[in-house]
């Protein structure tokens, strides 16, 4: 059994040692909630890694989007190269849930494009939890959605040992039961092939390695691992576990029991609809459900089988679904990164799902059991927590009220201080800002400007360009790839000024930024709340010469709190630096880490061009093949936005064939 072991040339510095000790002491005392209040650039991820190494427990890290989850996953893989670090996010590249619009009598069928690479990673994550304890899973909030029952998943796992008495056909039968498909030609993940006394299987958790079972009569003579592409034998195995090809795989006994319950629920619901004289809805429900029942009876599953998961799991109506959290052992550790953003997402999930399901059930598209194929309610999520650490530079009220221990990480290993804050009047703010921009550019640095509206961001950018400033703007309409390209170009000096509305998202920690300007700082609201202001101020905390200018005629409560907190931190940091003889150093962050994303963006701009108009059918076919290969490679390298863009282009080309 492996143990967590950090590989890093760094040792905990600054506030990290005391933060690690405080959190560890709290967790070892059995406290359920703790918070790491770490300023931007203080090395919160490294602190988390040290806590994991010390406690040696399976760990779930929750992030608020796929991009941030992928970044964290990469960082933890570097810290723990000998251990298992997995990535668990929604496997949909595109997802349109089934819905019904009564006003227009329009039923929208579920439409989804599943990313095979992410599905593989999800299976890899769940199977790892059954095999080892040194496992870290970085997940998005989609992990609180219903997943198959872990007990059923474990029960259906096929355990094979060398020397075991087992007929080949019996294993084949079990593989089909857990949703593997026989395919002797297109041998891929989740399939098996048979050649005489050889049975080759590609497990659901990998696409590069296969398992070869060699039989001698009814005995397993040999188990070998091989490279799927080359066929080269990698090594011998004494034992292998084949996990189900679907998290919703169910045993025959469960299916038989469940079909009766589905039929009972159907009869009860039909009586209810008929009594309300909803004859069309009753007819629709009977037809749709009977079709699903026949599919389950014949195949063991149907499209949308997750809508019957409550019955398949044997749960009572209204009870919480099984999720990724249920695959963890009871003593697992939970980190919620950027908790001030992630927790509100967890809270909002259930309500959005319920309102859509109401319409489907009311109009006879689904049985009431579909209500229980859902994300967890917030209270249910809380009950599943063993011990949790919230991680944020600006923890919200929930985190602060619930935490029995709060560790502050104010000192940065680089000695950098929180930036100086200057308040200037709104009158003449644009002219003053232009002067400040010129002064900052003359020192070789960059500028971030945050406005309140998209229109203002566009107008200000246009005005700056007219004055000869290399400026651009960024808003929510710009996708992740284009966003990464803009950041990279800002860092390389293609632009000197970046204007935006909400510049708080991950990835905007840019060492070259020496000025952050906040326009209309005294307009109270979401974008000028204490949390938003502190987060925005933090964008200037990567450069030793940086400052923040707030343009305001009045000092609001939010401004006062944000300024006061920044000054408090700055005082602590200054005293620490003087005491230890530390000179603040601007972070030296290579632009290299954005090049892959930039390359993607540069290539994807070609995809948006009208190049398909002049293509012949043969050329279109060739291009489709090239894009398909590239899409699969992009997905494999976790470049999911690029893969999605390529997928859209493939669809467009198919229409031109």
From Swiss-Prot:
Q: List the GO terms this entry assigns under cellular component, sorted alphabetically.
A: cytoplasm; excinuclease repair complex
Q: Which gene encodes it?
A: uvrB
- Protein known as: UvrABC system protein B
The record's note on its domains: The beta-hairpin motif is involved in DNA binding.
Q: Which organism is it from?
A: Clostridium botulinum (strain Eklund 17B / Type B)
Where does it reside? Answer: Cytoplasm
Q: Give the protein family.
A: Belongs to the UvrB family.
Question: Which stretches make up the Helicase C-terminal domain?
Answer: 429-595
All residue ranges annotated as the UVR domain in the record: 621-656
What the protein does? The UvrABC repair system catalyzes the recognition and processing of DNA lesions. A damage recognition complex composed of 2 UvrA and 2 UvrB subunits scans DNA for abnormalities. Upon binding of the UvrA(2)B(2) complex to a putative damaged site, the DNA wraps around one UvrB monomer. DNA wrap is dependent on ATP binding by UvrB and probably causes local melting of the DNA helix, facilitating insertion of UvrB beta-hairpin between the DNA strands. Then UvrB probes one DNA strand for the presence of a lesion.
Alphabetical GO biological process terms: nucleotide-excision repair; SOS response
Which Gene3D superfamilies is this protein grouped with? P-loop containing nucleotide triphosphate hydrolases, UVR domain
Return the motif ranges for Beta-hairpin.
91-114
Alphabetical list of InterPro entries matching this protein: Helicase/UvrB_N, Helicase_ATP-bd, Helicase_C-like, P-loop_NTPase, UVR_dom, UVR_dom_sf, UvrB, UvrB_inter
Keywords for this protein: ATP-binding, Cytoplasm, DNA damage, DNA excision, DNA repair, Excision nuclease, Helicase, Hydrolase, Nucleotide-binding, SOS response
Gene Ontology MF: a single term:
ATP binding
Query: Helicase ATP-binding domain: which residues?
Result: 25-182
Q: How does it assemble?
A: Forms a heterotetramer with UvrA during the search for lesions. Interacts with UvrC in an incision complex.
Q: Where does ATP bind?
A: 38-45
């Amino acid at each position: 059994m492996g143990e967590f072991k950090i590989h890093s040339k760094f040792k905990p510095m600054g506030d990290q040692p005391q933060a690690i000790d405080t959190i560890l002491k709290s967790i070892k005392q059995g406290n359920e909630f703790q918070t790491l209040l770490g300023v931007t650039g203080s090395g919160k991820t490294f602190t988390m890694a040290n806590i994991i190494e010390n406690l040696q427990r399976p760990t779930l890290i929750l992030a608020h989007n796929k991009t941030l989850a992928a970044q964290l996953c990469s960082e933890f893989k570097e810290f723990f190269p000998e251990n298992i670090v997995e990535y668990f996010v929604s496997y949909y590249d595109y997802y349109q849930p089934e819905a019904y619009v009564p006003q227009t009598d329009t039923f929208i069928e579920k439409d989804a494009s599943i990313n095979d690479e992410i599905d593989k990673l999800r299976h890899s994550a769940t199977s790892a939890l059954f095999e080892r304890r040194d496992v870290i899973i970085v997940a998005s909030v989609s992990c609180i959605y219903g997943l198959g029952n872990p007990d059923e998943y474990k029960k259906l796992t096929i355990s094979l040992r060398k020397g075991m008495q087992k007929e080949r056909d019996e294993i084949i039968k079990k593989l089909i039961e857990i949703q593997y498909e026989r395919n002797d030609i297109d041998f891929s993940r989740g399939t098996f092939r048979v050649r005489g006394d050889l049975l080759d299987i590609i497990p659901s958790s990998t696409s590069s390695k296969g398992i070869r079972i060699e039989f001698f009569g009814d005995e397993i003579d040999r188990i070998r691992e091989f490279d799927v592409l080359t066929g080269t034998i990698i090594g011998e195995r004494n034992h292998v576990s084949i996990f189900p090809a679907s998290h919703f795989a169910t045993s025959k006994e469960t299916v038989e029991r469940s079909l009766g319950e589905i039929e009972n629920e159907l009869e009860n619901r039909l009586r209810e609809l008929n009594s309300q004289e909803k004859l069309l809805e009753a007819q629709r429900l009977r037809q749709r459900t009977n079709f699903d029942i026949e599919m389950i009876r014949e195949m063991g599953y149907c499209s949308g089988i997750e809508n019957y998961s409550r019955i398949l799991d044997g749960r009572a109506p209204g009870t919480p679904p099984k999720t990724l959290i249920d695959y963890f052992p009871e003593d697992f550790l939970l980190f919620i990164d950027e908790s001030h953003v992630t927790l509100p997402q967890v809270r909002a999930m259930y309500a959005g799902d319920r309102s859509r399901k109401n319409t489907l059930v009311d109009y006879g598209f689904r049985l009431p059991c579909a209500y229980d194929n859902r994300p967890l309610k917030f209270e249910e999520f809380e009950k599943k927590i063993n011990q949790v650490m919230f991680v944020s530079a600006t923890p919200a009220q929930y985190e602060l009220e619930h935490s029995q221990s709060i560790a502050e990480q104010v000192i940065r290993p680089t000695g950098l201080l929180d930036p100086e804050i200057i308040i200037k009047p709104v009158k003449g703010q644009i002219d003053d800002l232009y002067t400040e921009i010129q002064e900052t550019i003359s020192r070789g640095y960059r500028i971030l400007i945050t406005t309140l509206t998209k229109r203002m961001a566009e107008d200000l950018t246009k005005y700056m360009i007219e004055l000869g400033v290399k400026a651009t703007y960024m808003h929510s309409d710009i996708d992740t790839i284009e966003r990464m390209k803009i950041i990279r170009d800002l860092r390389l000096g293609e632009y000197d000024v970046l204007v935006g509305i909400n510049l708080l998202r991950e990835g905007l920690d840019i060492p070259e930024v020496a000025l952050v300007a906040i326009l209309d700082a005294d307009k109270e609201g979401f974008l000028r709340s204490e949390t938003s202001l502190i987060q925005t101020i933090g964008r200037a905390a990567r450069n030793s010469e940086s400052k923040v200018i707030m343009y305001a005629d009045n000092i609001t409560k939010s401004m006062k709190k944000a300024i006061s907190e920044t000054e408090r931190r700055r005082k602590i940091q200054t005293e620490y630096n003087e005491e230890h003889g530390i000179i603040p150093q601007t972070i030296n962050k290579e632009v290299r880490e954005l090049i892959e994303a930039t390359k993607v963006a540069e290539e994807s701009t070609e995809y948006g061009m009208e190049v398909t108009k002049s293509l012949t059918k043969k050329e279109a076919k060739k291009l489709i093949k090239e894009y398909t290969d590239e899409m699969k490679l992009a997905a494999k390298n976790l470049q999911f936005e690029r893969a999605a863009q390529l997928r859209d282009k493939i669809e467009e080309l198919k229409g031109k064939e």
